[in-house]
UniProtKB/Swiss-Prot annotation:
Lineage, highest ranks first: Eukaryota, Metazoa, Chordata, Craniata, Vertebrata
Described function: Involved in pre-mRNA splicing. Functions in association with cyclin-dependent kinases (CDKs). May play a role in the regulation of RNA polymerase II (pol II). Inhibited by the CDK-specific inhibitor CDKN1A/p21.
Subunit organization: Interacts with POLR2A via its hyperphosphorylated C-terminal domain (CTD). Interacts with CDK11A, CDK11B, CDK12 and CDK13. May form a ternary complex with CDK11B and casein kinase II (CKII). Interacts with pre-mRNA-splicing factors, including at least SRSF1, SRSF2 AND SRSF7/SLU7.
Region (Cyclin-like 2): 204-288
UniProt protein name: Cyclin-L1
Length: 527
């Protein structure tokens, strides 16, 4: 049999009280039972024996009062009680700043107590849950407030508690995260309580009972009983007893404090269906609240964090993991790196790796080349055959390089002359300097064919020149000393210039014999 608080509609109460588990146990009220031919009621995929429609709020059974989920996570009872008191004080203070009715603040505190009898303070932040409870209570009591206002009020209370200068809350990523946490906590409260979140308060019951006792005109008695009832919201009496019993206990305590006599033959509370033992237990629980010290928020937060870390360590230890998430070595069957017969750290000095030998030989060759480059003969030793070959190769390269570089200043000089003469002289000088270029066959025909052959010779010489540049190996280019090459280039520049002048004079004389009339003008222009 499931029971729940006062529903908004009959259909909602039927579905809520039957489909979702309630935090309470047995309750009295109007009960309607519907039985099918199979002996139960099928709602969804679950079979229920009966559906109870009641206006009474749920009461937590005695077996769930101790141990609580927080105590099972390692939190002691005094710390849990202080956290409950502190959370209810936050809800009460925030409700005053939000200008909520007292009924809404009372509903939020009752929801706070109910939730933490199902969940642990170690796993859930009591401040976030307090925000969610007061936000949910404002909706239940038809006085809704925005989540932004709730967060701002709790931020202000936190600053006052820390004795800091009040400052507005910055709307940054932390605010967005807090807002999302409050929304998720509100859903969690609804789910955990089975959406049975309506609370029957004893506020109106107190006024009604005092009218029966003809004490409603005593405003001091009414206000004192009302105050005791509001203070008892910080305790767990609202989840343990019926609202009628709580109203009788508040009137009993106020009349004793003000020394106002009430009927005793028979006792007045027997008229309302309560017992003296329950009234005395509620009074003791309420008066104990005034003897407790004010809870320290910082110490409670540290205690909760400590228990949270211990719980996390216990979970990781049960899974065989370290604190950083890595697997523990003790769970790997006694594995130890030192237990191996031969460790890779132990390397014999006599043994040499073939890789290291190859590296040494590779490193030795550039050292020999560097030592050879420091010699006055361009790094060539006379007593080896390899050094002779490298010297001859370096000389031929230096000559070829100097010749190719010597064309650079002449190129600007030849631009002043005719284009055909420049191309022909340049192609012939380059073809003579490169031994790899093929021998030219002069065609003594028309000047157009000569120009065509001249362009072909220029292309072939350029192509062979590129091939020669690409064929040079990297090792030969490293052996050439830059300073010696520049000195040779300066020394031999005049010599090669003379050779080019002689070659051009020879060409002019050779052409003059065969083409005296056609090329004579160009020859005079060169001179």
């Amino acid at each position: 049999m499931a029971s729940g608080p006062h529903p908004t509609s009959t259909a909602a109460a039927a579905s809520a009280s039957s489909a979702a588990p309630s935090a309470g146990g047995s309750s009295s009220g109007t009960t309607t039972t519907t039985t099918t031919t199979t002996g139960g009621i099928l709602i969804g995929d679950r079979l229920y024996s009966e559906v109870s429609l009641t206006i009474d709020h749920s009461v937590i059974p005695e077996e769930r009062l101790s141990p609580t989920p927080s105590m099972q996570d390692g939190l002691d009872l005094p710390s849990e009680t202080d956290l409950r008191i502190l959370g209810c004080e936050l809800i009460q203070a925030a409700g005053i700043l939000l200008r909520l009715p007292q009924v809404a603040m009372a509903t939020g505190q009752v929801l706070f107590h109910r939730f933490f009898y199902s969940k642990s303070f170690v796993k859930h932040s009591f401040e976030i849950v307090a925000m969610a409870c007061i936000n949910l209570a404002s909706k239940i009591e038809e006085a809704p407030r925005r989540i932004r206002d709730v967060i701002n009020v709790f931020h202000h209370l936190r600053q006052l508690r820390g004795k800091r200068t009040p400052s507005p809350l910055i709307l940054d990523q932390n605010y967005i995260n807090t807002k999302n946490q409050v929304i998720k906590a509100e859903r969690r409260v609804l789910k955990e309580l089975g959406f049975c979140v309506h609370v029957k308060h004893p506020h109106k019951i107190i006024v009604m009972y005092l009218q029966v006792l003809e004490c409603e005109r005593n405003q001091t008695l009414v206000q004192t009983a009302w105050n005791y009832m509001n203070d008892s919201l910080r305790t767990n009496v609202f989840v343990r007893f019926q609202p009628e019993t709580i109203a009788c206990a508040c009137i009993y305590l106020a009349a004793r404090a003000l020394q106002i006599p009430l009927p005793t033959r028979p006792h007045w509370f027997l008229l309302f269906g309560t017992t003296e033992e329950e009234i005395q237990e509620i009074c003791i629980e309420t008066l104990r609240l005034y003897t407790r010290k004010k809870p320290n928020y910082e110490l409670l937060e540290k205690e909760v964090e400590k228990r949270k870390v211990a719980l996390q360590e216990a979970k990781l230890k049960a899974k065989g993991l370290n604190l950083d998430g890595t697997p523990a070595l003790s769970t790997l069957g006694g594995f130890s790196p030192a237990s191996k017969p031969s460790s890779p750290r132990e390397v014999k000095a006599e043994e040499k790796s073939p890789v290291s030998i190859n590296v040494k030989t590779v490193k030795k060759e550039p050292e020999d080349r560097q030592q050879a480059s420091k010699s006055p003969y361009n790094g060539v030793r006379k007593d080896s055959k390899r050094s002779r070959n490298s010297r001859s190769a370096s000389r031929s390269r230096s000559r070829t390089r100097s010749r190719s570089r010597s064309h650079t200043p002449r190129r600007h000089y030849n631009n002043r002359r005719s284009r055909s003469g420049t191309y022909s002289s340049r192609s012939r000088s380059r073809s003579r300097s490169h031994s790899e270029s093929p021998r030219r066959h002069h065609n003594h025909g028309s000047p157009h064919l000569k120009a065509k052959h001249t362009r072909e010779d220029l292309k072939s010489s350029n192509r062979h020149g590129h091939k020669r540049k690409k064929s040079r190996s990297r090792s030969q280019s490293k052996t050439r000393d830059h300073s010696d090459v520049t000195k040779k280039h300066r020394h031999e520049r005049g010599h090669h210039r003379d050779r080019r002048e002689r070659s051009r004079s020879f060409e002019r004389s050779h052409k003059g014999k065969h083409h005296g009339g056609s090329r004579s003008g160009h020859g005079r222009h060169r001179r």
